[in-house]
């Protein structure tokens, strides 16, 4: 299996690649995990992973038209895709961090700052471990997990106005926070699977064996 971690000058590329290798080993999957922005690699990949940290606008600019087109072509042809943190956010219609920036438009909704005014105790960024709520068996990504397992979050912006049908798991932080989304062969996690220890490795392993 060829797994490509998209190189778009974003953060966490090496740690995401290493986590994917470890998850593959745990699942007994032979996986060649590479970090690349090369069209041949991306268009011939068996799995695509888009990590991300930083601002939505900066990450979107890092993709540029060429990588956007490659990702659109590959995923339209059925290649499973996993976005992590800002990589997940880029799947939506647009983001409002540092001005309005268009996303990939694969899922409904937009990325806005979480509302500190709604809860006096809310502090941003939302950083640290938080519990995941989901319906067991509803999606392969959560196989082997139980509601109440924890993911590691670091973000101040989150998905708003999304479609309930895209939601796989949520967390609570002053309000409901979309934690895992999926539509067809495209999925994403708001939390950092590469930092989420056994839970993250389980999700990555499920992604590697996932057929949408």
From Swiss-Prot:
The GO biological-process annotations, alphabetized, read as:
L-histidine biosynthetic process
Please give the SUPFAM superfamilies that the UniProt record associates with this protein: Class I glutamine amidotransferase-like
| Signal peptide positions (record) | none
Main location (coarse class): cytoplasm
What domain of life does the UniProt record list for this protein's source? Bacteria
Catalyses: 5-[(5-phospho-1-deoxy-D-ribulos-1-ylimino)methylamino]-1-(5-phospho-beta-D-ribosyl)imidazole-4-carboxamide + L-glutamine = D-erythro-1-(imidazol-4-yl)glycerol 3-phosphate + 5-amino-1-(5-phospho-beta-D-ribosyl)imidazole-4-carboxamide + L-glutamate + H(+); L-glutamine + H2O = L-glutamate + NH4(+)
UniProt keyword list = Amino-acid biosynthesis, Cytoplasm, Glutamine amidotransferase, Histidine biosynthesis, Hydrolase, Lyase
Which PROSITE patterns does UniProt cross-reference here? GATASE_TYPE_1
Active site feature: 85, 192, 194
Instruction: Report the pathway entry.
Output: Amino-acid biosynthesis; L-histidine biosynthesis; L-histidine from 5-phospho-alpha-D-ribose 1-diphosphate: step 5/9
What one GO molecular function would you report for this record? Answer: imidazoleglycerol-phosphate synthase activity
Q: Does the keyword Hydrolase apply?
A: yes
| Documented EC number(s) | 4.3.2.10, 3.5.1.2
Which Gene Ontology cellular component annotation is one that this UniProt entry carries? cytoplasm
Quaternary structure, from the entry: Heterodimer of HisH and HisF.
HAMAP family per record: HisH
Question: What's this protein's name?
Answer: Imidazole glycerol phosphate synthase subunit HisH
